[in-house]
Amino acid sequence: YVKLENYPMAKEAFFRELELRKKYLGWEDEDTILACQNLGVLHSFCNEREEALACFREAYGHEVKKNGEDSEMAQKLLQYISVVES
């Protein structure tokens, strides 16, 4: 959990983790999808709706390709998208 004043540093760390995972592990690795979801949660916590939605949608797209739209992670990501959109 991050205090709002620490958000820029946390955002950079989460973003770097995601970029490294994408580069070295690819989207086939579950932890890459989770890292994208976590960055989306951080954006959402700080009321950055568009950034959060972008992360959740990207993670959802890769999760559906990997495990199908009925997977637990895909359903969780859809819930996040729904909450942020409302």
Where does each model-flagged region fall?
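Intrinsic-disorder-linked linear interaction elements in eukaryotic regulatory proteins
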Residues: 1-86
